């Protein structure tokens, strides 16, 4: 007899992790605006605090509304469990700090979002964790950088802002041969719609849920997804925090007690508990609403982005276009291997003339908003050199894939003709001034 449970993305985004509320029969996910939860008796409370029984204690650690969001994301990504956070940066921090301690390092591509690059370059070294940045994402270069103190390999699904797509399976093989988990930031993968890195060897996935998952520019959030596939017991020497007695839980062994969900449990009950970067239930409800239309929006984002990229290629004012959906992009063939539902919703381009001309193009948009975000249903533009990557040195910006003339566009779900019309009027206004100068 076939399994009747839903497995398709479009159904999971609406139903995974939730049944109608048993107390009220509410079909929508209720917002549980509570700090804490009553215990049935003192023994029940003791079992919860001792991790001998699952349940709610305090909303800094777990909340029923947040729990639905976590279960839904885990289902969409093909993981066994997820832990939500107050932002993508917090989720990323929790994932890495659960793996690496003072004296350890991680190996990461240099093709990173500016905030990630700064977290790895500035914040983690203050905690004794260093990052070995590899130029690009070639597996052989990553392998060469791994040493006995390496605790993770880190890549982005679609690198921001170079839009490179790593060969996940090859990189995962390299990491696993060394006994190290592969961590993938799948933010640009739109909650697993464009690609599920876990299906290609990733062990841990992180998201800024602020972007396509939320999808409307209203809510900051993040999430860590545990694949449940990494064998912490086999790699006990490198990761004793999962296999040796926990000082904070009277000698509890996470791997022996929780098996495949050991990573997610430790992130929740040690890192999230102590860091305090919890997602609040109101934000979780907004992100759940975003998930319900994710596939519809992502499909439109991708089709609009491809159409805009092709239009820009033919425009006389444009000197170059970078979008992984274009055949000439260096990652296009790899992208076709992994991105089966579209090539994402972000592109960059440069205009002819001095670098300042690019800023004028952004300033002259009327429909398109100039702001620091991606994944909104509205089309967004920004000049990364002077904003998202401004805190990096010139060489670090170039290494990350940012050039002084680059304009990044997060393509929204408006009608493509209206998006193009805004480009046309902006170009007309900009180059009229340039010609008259």
From Swiss-Prot:
Gene Ontology molecular function terms on file: cysteine synthase activity; O-acetylhomoserine sulfhydrylase activity; pyridoxal phosphate binding
Cofactor(s) in the UniProt record: pyridoxal 5'-phosphate
Major site of localization recorded for this protein: cytoplasm
The protein's Enzyme Commission number: 2.5.1.49
Pathway the protein contributes to: Amino-acid biosynthesis; L-methionine biosynthesis via de novo pathway; L-homocysteine from O-acetyl-L-homoserine
Cellular compartment(s): Cytoplasm
Keyword Transmembrane helix assigned: no
Enzyme superclass (EC): transferase
InterPro entries: Cys/Met-Metab_PyrdxlP-dep_enz, Cys_met_metab_PP, OAc-hSer/O-AcSer_sulfhydrylase, PyrdxlP-dep_Trfase, PyrdxlP-dep_Trfase_major, PyrdxlP-dep_Trfase_small
SUPFAM superfamilies in the record: PLP-dependent transferases (SSF53383)
Induction: Up-regulated under sulfur limitation and down-regulated by high methionine concentrations.
GO CC list: cytoplasm
Protein's UniProt keywords contain Cytoplasm: yes
Sorted UniProt keywords: Amino-acid biosynthesis, Cytoplasm, Methionine biosynthesis, Pyridoxal phosphate, Transferase
One GO BP: transsulfuration
N6-(pyridoxal phosphate)lysine: residues bearing it: 211
Mutation effect (residue 231 to E): In strain: JAM 2006
Catalytic activity: O-acetyl-L-homoserine + methanethiol = L-methionine + acetate + H(+); O-acetyl-L-homoserine + hydrogen sulfide = L-homocysteine + acetate
Coiled coil: none
Known role: Catalyzes the conversion of O-acetyl-L-homoserine (OAH) into homocysteine in the methionine biosynthesis pathway. Also has cysteine synthase (O-acetylserine sulfhydrylase) activity in vitro, but seems only be involved in the alternative pathway of methionine biosynthesis in E.nidulans.
Further comment found in the protein's record: E.nidulans has another enzyme having cysteine synthase (O-acetylserine sulfhydrylase) activity (cysB) that has been shown to be the enzyme of physiological importance in cysteine biosynthesis.
Similarity comment text for this entry: Belongs to the trans-sulfuration enzymes family.
Subunit structure: Oligomer, probably homohexamer.
Protein name, entry field: Homocysteine synthase
Species name: Emericella nidulans (strain FGSC A4 / ATCC 38163 / CBS 112.46 / NRRL 194 / M139) (Aspergillus nidulans)
Name of the coding gene: cysD
């Amino acid at each position: 007899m076939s399994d009747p449970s839903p497995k398709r993305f479009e159904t999971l985004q609406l139903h995974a992790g939730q049944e109608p509320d048993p107390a009220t029969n509410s079909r929508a996910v209720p917002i549980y605006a509570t700090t804490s939860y009553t215990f049935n008796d003192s023994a029940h409370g003791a079992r919860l605090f001792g991790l001998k029984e699952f349940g709610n204690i305090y909303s800094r650690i777990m909340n029923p509304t947040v729990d639905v969001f976590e279960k839904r994301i885990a289902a969409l990504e093909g993981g066994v469990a997820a832990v939500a956070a107050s932002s993508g940066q917090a989720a990323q921090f929790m994932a890495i700090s659960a793996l690496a301690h003072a004296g350890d390092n991680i190996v990461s591509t240099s093709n990173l979002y500016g905030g990630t690059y700064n977290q790895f370059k500035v914040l983690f070294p203050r905690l004794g964790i260093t990052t070995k940045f590899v130029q690009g994402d070639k597996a052989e270069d990553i392998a060469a950088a791994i040493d006995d103190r390496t605790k993770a390999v880190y890549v982005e699904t679609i690198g921001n802002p170079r839009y490179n797509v790593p060969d996940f399976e090859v990189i995962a093989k390299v990491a696993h041969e060394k006994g190290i988990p592969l961590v993938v930031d799948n933010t640009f993968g739109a909650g697993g719609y464009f690609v599920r890195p876990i299906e290609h060897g990733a062990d841990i996935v992180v998201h800024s849920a602020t972007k396509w998952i939320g999808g409307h520019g209203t809510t900051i959030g993040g999430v860590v997804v545990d694949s449940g596939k990494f064998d912490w017991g086999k790699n006990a020497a490198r990761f004793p925090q999962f296999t040796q007695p926990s000082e904070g839980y009277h000698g509890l062994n996470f791997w022996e007690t929780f098996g495949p969900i050991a990573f997610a449990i430790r992130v929740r009950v040690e890192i999230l508990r102590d860091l305090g970067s919890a997602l609040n239930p109101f934000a979780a409800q907004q992100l759940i609403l975003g998930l319900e239309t994710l596939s519809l929006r992502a499909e439109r984002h991708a089709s609009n982005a491809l159409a805009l990229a092709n239009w820009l290629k033919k425009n006389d004012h444009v000197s170059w276009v970078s979008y992984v959906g274009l055949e000439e992009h260096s990652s296009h063939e790899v992208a076709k291997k992994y991105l089966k539902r579209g090539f994402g919703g972000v592109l960059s381009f440069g205009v002819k003339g001095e670098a300042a001309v690019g800023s004028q193009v952004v300033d002259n948009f009327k429909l398109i908003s100039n702001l620091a975000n991606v994944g909104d249903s509205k089309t967004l533009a920004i000049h990364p050199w002077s904003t998202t990557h401004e805190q990096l040195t010139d060489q670090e910006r170039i290494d990350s894939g940012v050039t002084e003339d680059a304009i990044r566009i997060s393509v929204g779900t408006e009608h493509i003709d209206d998006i193009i019309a805004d480009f046309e009027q902006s170009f007309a206004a900009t180059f009229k001034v340039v010609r008259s100068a």
